[in-house]
């Protein structure tokens, strides 16, 4: 590989040459912080990823949480354009051009953006570090470049990333995680989240007090949860994890990070305890939803000392939910609060995958508080410590997203990204979004692919097929829809328990899908080998045990490889 490619350029045109070490088949680049003290922006490795229109190959960059997949950029004719995005789920990208075939791995101690450009018939890809926002220069920038064979496939790049992380102990196989009973159970059976109570979201009362707090709507009481469990049993659902959302004081997002006491309008503490015991007695598992990142002023645990401080010296208000304006809690304080609040929750005798909201779906905030400064690297370390602490306390751990720094001890992610849940994102540099995350991490953790694939049986044909092709764990949600006048990122069609007919319909649907999934559950333990985009809208997921799943993403019947595949249908073969 040509080392002249291993340079960076600052905003003044200055060229930065890294220290280079060759080790274990990789090039390790270090851009030393001492050389970056007066730099505002740094364009990283701009010479490494360039290709003329019409060239063979591709760039592959990771999705962020607003996207429906990872960006496969092929060098087809396009008008000049540029596309920039940041906060990616994975911290690596792939370059395959006539000159270079490499996996590029970026240490996650800074926030950075991907910039993909097409200009004068040339495609280019670089990452940009902006030291005027988020983190100032405080550490070296470290990048690993892994040379790949010239004909490397998506599966080869995924396998390289997975194997390196396994060897270094950054992740562990799902087979290892399944030695915990709750995780093995989750592998075989669906998740059923139940949103119980909430105030209007977003709330018209931005700064809530005990005097002006809006009414909480008690939609599913603890007694009603027992009815749902009975209906599941009556419909023959052999196993399920019921996860209660909005069980806490003032309901979902109502007073976070305050949890206790359980909301009286739902039945209070005694009814919660009764419900936990009841669900377990039926042979199901049960867990609760908590949140350490959001803080609203009405919480009895609220303190401004917990809140993230921006580079401008302002408290970081991020989110507008049932409790009004929410402020993000510094990672250092999130861990403190988890250790303060979660032991009381753990004493309730829960036996499912405890759910801490948000922590695995965002890159940790940069906090510039003088009392508790926390830059990205420290934030990630503290997030990992929080996940570890919570997992050891409850026995298993789940969260909202699947950021790669969280995966070692994340047993299940509610969705890899929001997909098109907030609307389709226009990405002018590609027309192909691929499941590179799933290709890399299937067999490492359980996940649901996107927020629209929650409640997948009642969603669009594309959502249902996406769920299957990307290897998801069945994930259902009673009352997923709760936002007023804003997008509901899990969709506008829903499962509800407002009357017995609706509840029993949902239970019957879950029973059918649980039975179908039973024959696929063992495949969760198997790595994906490749994911191929064929002609005629056929996509193929290939597993390392020889299993192949062919999906027809079109409205027309397709003949492929000796198989007839119905519109939006699929075929499994070995």
Where are the predicted features?
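Carbohydrate-recognition beta-sandwich/jelly-roll modules
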Residues: 1-241, 285, 568-570
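Intrinsically disordered, low-complexity acidic/polar segments
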Residues: 38-40, 251, 295-297, 559-560
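A broadly tuned preference for mixed-charge, low-complexity surface segments
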Residues: 77-88, 183-201, 283-301, 337-346, ...
């Amino acid at each position: 590989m040509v080392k002249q490619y291993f340079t960076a350029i600052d905003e003044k045109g200055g060229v930065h040459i890294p220290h280079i070490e060759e080790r274990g088949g990789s090039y390790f680049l270090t851009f030393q912080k001492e050389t970056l003290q007066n730099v505002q922006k740094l364009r990283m490795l701009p010479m490494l990823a360039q290709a003329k229109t019409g060239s063979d190959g591709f760039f592959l960059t990771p999705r962020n949480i607003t996207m429906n997949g990872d960006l496969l950029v092929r060098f087809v004719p396009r008008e000049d354009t540029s596309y920039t995005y940041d906060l990616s789920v994975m911290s690596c990208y792939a370059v395959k051009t006539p000159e270079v075939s490499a996996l590029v791995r970026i240490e996650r101690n800074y926030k950075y953006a991907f910039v993909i450009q097409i200009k004068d018939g040339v495609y280019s890809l670089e990452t940009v570090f902006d030291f005027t926002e988020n983190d100032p220069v405080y550490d070296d920038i470290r990048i690993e470049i892994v040379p790949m064979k010239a004909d490397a496939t998506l599966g080869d790049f995924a396998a390289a990333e997975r194997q390196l992380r396994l060897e270094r102990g950054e992740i562990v196989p799902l087979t290892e995680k399944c030695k915990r009973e709750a995780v093995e159970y989750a592998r075989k059976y669906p998740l059923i989240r139940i949103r119980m109570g909430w105030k209007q979201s977003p709330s018209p009362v931005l700064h809530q007090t005990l005097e002006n707090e809006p009414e909480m709507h008690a939609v599913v009481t603890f007694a009603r949860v027992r009815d749902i469990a009975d209906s599941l049993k009556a419909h023959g659902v052999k196993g399920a994890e019921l996860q209660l959302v909005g069980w806490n004081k003032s309901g979902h997002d109502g007073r976070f990070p305050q949890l206790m006491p359980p909301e009286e309008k739902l039945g209070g503490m005694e009814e919660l305890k009764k419900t936990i015991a009841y669900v377990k007695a039926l042979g199901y598992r049960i867990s609760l939803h908590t949140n350490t990142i959001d803080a609203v002023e009405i919480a009895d645990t609220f303190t401004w000392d917990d809140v993230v401080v921006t580079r401008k010296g302002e408290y970081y208000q991020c989110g507008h939910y049932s409790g009004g304006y929410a402020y993000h809690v510094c990672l250092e304080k999130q861990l403190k609060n988890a250790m303060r609040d979660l032991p009381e929750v753990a004493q309730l005798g829960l036996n499912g995958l405890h759910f801490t909201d948000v922590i695995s779906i965002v890159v940790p905030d940069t906090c510039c508080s003088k009392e508790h400064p926390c830059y990205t690297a420290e934030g990630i370390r503290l997030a990992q410590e929080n996940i570890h602490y919570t997992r050891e306390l409850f026995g298993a751990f789940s969260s909202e997203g699947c950021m790669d720094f969280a995966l070692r001890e994340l047993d299940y992610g509610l969705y890899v990204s929001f997909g098109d849940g907030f609307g389709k994102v226009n990405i002018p540099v590609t027309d192909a979004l691929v499941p590179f995350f799933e290709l890399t991490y299937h067999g490492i953790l359980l996940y649901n692919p996107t927020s629209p694939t929650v409640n997948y049986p009642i969603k669009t044909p594309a959502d249902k097929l996406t769920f299957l092709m990307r290897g998801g764990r069945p994930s259902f949600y009673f009352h997923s829809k709760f936002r007023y006048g804003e997008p509901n990122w899990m969709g506008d069609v829903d499962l509800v328990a407002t009357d017995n007919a609706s509840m029993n319909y949902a239970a019957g649907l879950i029973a059918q899908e649980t039975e179908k999934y039973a024959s696929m559950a063992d495949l969760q333990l198997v790595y994906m080998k490749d994911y191929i985009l064929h002609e005629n809208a056929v996509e193929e997921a290939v597993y390392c045990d020889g299993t192949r799943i062919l999906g027809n993403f079109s409205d027309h019947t397709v003949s492929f490889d000796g198989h007839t595949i119905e519109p939006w249908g699929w075929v499994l073969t070995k």
